[in-house]
């Protein structure tokens, strides 16, 4: 499949299409064997850790506080992530005010992660990271562009929080470059982008060789099925929008209570079934 899209380019839309086909083939294999995907891949664990992810810069204070309080209080998820890097790094003061608010809401014990979506310059990211550490931030995602491998490595060498990137890796080669550059403390991967389940497993194996953990980007219910079979998985992103869509249209969605997703060994294949009638009103083609 990768050779077939060489002339139009492997990254972007082509990669997501390849990833979808690969994932579907794994689903077919599990169906033919009559077993859950998690069992087919081999279970290293019965459940996978998740972190609540949302906290968009467009949220007002009350909205941010309510979302964080629900994750930590209602769902008992012990780790959460918010967005920073508003206006492409042009509003550091509000970024830091929101981090301070988040820490106040979740209390001293929950882990606090931030994602700048590549908004900062290298020196700026180092400066911001020093302030983040004051609030106990332990995860700094894409402090600079994920294409700036030298910049990521420079930030990583100078800051206390773990530096993470990789959600835009479209191939095994992309992940290999991040690892070789010493750009990350934790490699992010996305089954829907990196070549499907096959690509995710291959990149995870590369990370094992570099003594790195991996973290799954979005699509939490899909990644949970894969994640139980990945020995170096650190956690899965329980992303606000994705989990909402999964609940709207699918049966078999897992509950994140206690900060863990637990694939049901009694549910075969990918574990979810599309409710086609619920999705039909949103059809556009």
State what each model feature region is.
Residues 87-89, 121, 147-148, 196:
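Conserved protein kinase catalytic core
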Residues 55-58, 119, 145, 168-169, ...:
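Short, surface-exposed acidic/glycine-rich loop or hinge patches that mediate macromolecular interfaces
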Residues 130, 136, 147-260:
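Shared catalytic-loop signature of beta/alpha-barrel
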Residues 1-112, 117-119, 126, 130-134, ...:
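N-terminal capping/lid subdomain adjacent to the active-site entrance of alpha/beta enzymes
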Residues 50-54, 78-82, 110-116, 140-141, ...:
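Hydrophobic faces of well-ordered beta-strands that scaffold small-molecule active sites
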Residues 120-121, 223:
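Short, active-site-adjacent cap segments at secondary-structure transitions
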Residues 37-40, 139-143, 217:
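Flexible, glycine/charged-enriched surface loops at secondary-structure junctions
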